[in-house]
Amino acid sequence: MHARRSLLKFVAAAIGLSLAGGASVALAQAKLKVAAVYTVPVEQQWVSRIHKALNAAKDRGEIEYVFSEKVANADYERVMREFAEKGNQLIVGESFAVEAAARKVAKDYPKTAFRMGSSGKPQAPNFAVFDNYIQEPAYLTGMIAGGMTKSNRIGMVGGYPIPEVNRLMHAFMAGAKEVNPKVEFTVTFIGSWFDPPKAKEAAFAMIEKGADVLYAERFGVSDAAKERGKFAIGNVIDTQREYPNTVVASALWNMEPTIDRALKAVKGNAFKAEDYGQYSLMKYKGSELAPLGTFASKVPADLVARVKAKEKDILDGKFKVAVVETEPKSTAK
């Protein structure tokens, strides 16, 4: 009888250990449920960087990732709520045009983490914000543009004159002015985040007025530059592969540092309302100057040296790019 009880205890213990082990494995393999809401197609520059970082986390097996793209502003709140109701632990998106609605949803789902591109401040307890703080590489690309223009006229095509766009344009202009004080700018906003034909037409108009370098804040600008044999400077992504003889340099935005920090916070039950914007700075590897690639031998060596020296000063904390968020104005006559 004693032997039988001992055997039963042994079996029970073994089963308990097995179950505990299984639970541990299941816990270790548990993936965060992440959803994203995008107002534009995922191939659009800005959103593509978020999409890329989230897909990387998905490929590593860290998250389950679902998203909705081309969501109209009027539908944004509804889509956010649907994702929250489905138990997604982190919801990512861009709330620039739907700020009030997005914050209302976050308030209604306090146990869900929200990390939204926003011009506003964080909202306790669960609405964190982020932004593409890539003014540092934008300054460096401006230096290159200022050194490459022959006409001393640079055209700049943007989506909307919001702080997130304005600061990049001002940084670019300041970089160009450092290298070439004579340079003048023509600035146009097309009133859309994704309208390549309209951006292209705006760029053509600038070329007609003498611009030989174009700042491509929107898709479509590089197409105009290519067709007219002019140079383009990329923003957020590097499209030199598609435009090998047109895109001289690009300011790259890397969303991985921002996304990875948010995922870590949610996993550790430490997510809170904070501003993730700083993780887009070069020191966090959140942004960088793209390799010159096909233009490595075409950009003057002395200009490359100046840019590299400035890049080092930025990384060493010896030079700080000014953040100017007012609407940039044309200076060309």
Locate predicted features.
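Flexible loop/hinge segments that line or gate small-molecule binding clefts
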Residues: 107-132, 236-246
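An alpha-beta-alpha
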Residues: 54, 140-183, 187, 275-299
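N-terminal export leaders
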Residues: 4-12
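Hinge/cleft segment of the Venus flytrap/periplasmic-binding protein
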Residues: 267-333
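Short beta-strand elements at the ligand-binding edges of bilobed clamshell
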Residues: 122-144, 156-161, 244-257
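Periplasmic-binding protein-like
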Residues: 36, 88-95, 115-117, 209-219, ...
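Sec/Tat signal peptide C-region and signal peptidase I cleavage site
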Residues: 22-28
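Extracytoplasmic "Venus flytrap"
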Residues: 33-60, 66-76, 96, 161-167
